[in-house]
Regions:
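Nucleotide-activated donor-binding/catalytic signature segment of Leloir-type glycosyltransferases, i.e.
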Residues: 234-257
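Conserved donor-binding/catalytic core segment of Leloir-type glycosyltransferases
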Residues: 6, 143, 179-208, 224
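Short hydrophobic beta-strand element within catalytic cores of glycosyltransferases
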Residues: 288, 293, 297-300, 310
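N-terminal subdomain of nucleotide-sugar transferases
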Residues: 1-47
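Carbohydrate-associated surface elements
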Residues: 148, 169
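Short His-centered aromatic/hydrophobic patch
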Residues: 90-96, 114
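Acidic donor-binding loop of glycosyltransferase active sites
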Residues: 264-279, 296
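Conserved acidic donor-binding segment of nucleotide-sugar-dependent glycosyltransferases
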Residues: 288, 312-313, 317-324, 333-339, ...
């Protein structure tokens, strides 16, 4: 009989959280998924769980963190009794603390998948640190995106033996066949328009680059930015102030297929990730891996897990966070040296294909779930 996994996640709707949907598609198990933002009238237990998650959120805002762990945990316990899974997989640490007590009450093994802000945002991390310590007493397995994330959780008592580092990975079926040497002088950025993604710094660097290029390259250089978010208006103002409206395009949201097509039309991929003012940082950006798997060279920062995937001078060019001048120079190298772009892109594709595809990620997650389920079974078969 195949392993039965109950997957709990805070949201099905977030457009940027395609990795949760990817796990639903790719993990080779029987899967039951329940999302905290859904309240389906035809499924009373899932409806009650959605209401309980809302109550848990409200109690968290009020600072009643211990009490906040009870409402959703109670409905999760009922879900466990109803579905009788072999193991529970919870996406995001902040969601796991809402439901974690159900694992202790039921004996169902608990695996938690940390993604990024749940292990880095200063306000969130500090507020939940005691709850995380309790969480680590109840977990059988932990999945993290990078070594810095692993170290952050270990500082709160997470067991390194139960932890696996596994970036979410890129899909080879979508991301392939870029030819940066033959592409126009076009740079591409993909990600939510939030502080940790550094879209403002990316545009500032591009503005510096354009100002020093000679014609005709100066007029031909382009920067395409895919994504939406709270910085969108500020970003558009910056583009207008720099008189770059003809060369910087804010494309909004695009489907994975459209992003893959854009990557096949670009010279390089750029992302100036930084630690945000609230302490939020990346895990290991999926778009960086998708770009490399496509065959694009990457210009990015030495931030979070990025240096674990992008090797400076081999598969891309890395600069320090907030060093806009170095970012401009690295972008310029890709536009001025198409042969360099091709060499870096080819090496990046090999690196991701050999260790950072979504299939590698599914294999790692499957291993954690199987080991956790094998350690103990809560149900009498």
């Amino acid at each position: 009989m195949p392993l039965h996994v109950l997957l709990l996640a805070p949201s099905r709707r977030a457009a940027s959280e395609t990795f949760i949907r990817a796990n639903l598609r790719g993990l080779p198990f029987r899967k039951t998924a329940v999302f905290g933002d859904e309240r389906p009238l035809g499924r009373p237990l899932a409806f009650a769980h959605g209401l309980a998650v809302l109550l848990s959120k409200a109690l968290t805002v009020l600072g009643l963190l211990r009490l906040a762990s009870l409402p959703a945990a109670c409905t999760t316990w009922l879900l466990l009794q109803r579905h009788r899974p072999d193991v529970m997989l919870v996406d995001f640490g902040f969601h796991a603390v809402r439901v974690m007590e159900a694992a202790g009450w039921s004996g169902v093994p608990l695996v938690v998948h940390f993604r990024g802000s749940d292990a880095s945002s200063e306000s969130k991390f500090q507020r939940l640190r005691d709850r995380y310590r309790r969480l680590f007493q109840l977990t059988d397995g932990l999945i993290v995106k990078s070594r810095p994330m692993q170290q952050a959780l270990q500082s709160l008592g997470a067991d390194s033996e139960s932890m696996v580092i596994s970036p979410s990975g890129a899909d080879p079926a979508l991301f392939h066949r870029a030819d940066p040497a033959a592409a126009p002088p076009r740079l591409l950025a993909v990600g939510r328009l939030v502080a940790k993604k550094g879209p403002l710094q990316t545009v500032q660097a591009f503005a510096r680059l354009v100002a020093r290029l000679d014609e005709p390259l100066r007029s031909r250089a382009e920067l395409l930015i895919v994504g939406e978010g709270p910085l969108q208006d500020q970003l558009q103002e910056l583009v207008d102030d720099q008189q770059l409206s003809g060369q910087v395009q804010l494309l909004g949201l695009r489907s994975p297929q459209q992003i893959a097509d854009l990557m096949r039309s670009a010279r390089g991929f750029v992302q100036h990730s930084v630690v945000a003012p609230d302490g939020d940082s990346e895990g290991n950006p999926v778009a960086v891996m998708e770009a490399q798997l496509s065959g694009l060279p990457v210009v990015a920062t030495r931030h979070a897990g990025i240096p674990e995937v992008v090797l400076d001078g081999d598969t891309g060019l890395l600069v320090e966070e907030e060093d806009v001048e170095a970012m401009a120079q690295a972008m310029g190298r890709l536009l001025l040296e198409p042969e360099l772009a091709a060499r870096l892109g080819a090496a990046g594709r090999r690196r991701v294909a050999n260790g950072f595809t979504v299939q590698h990620h599914w294999f790692a997650v499957s291993g954690v779930l199987e080991r956790s389920a094998a350690a103990r079974s809560p149900w009498t078969r």
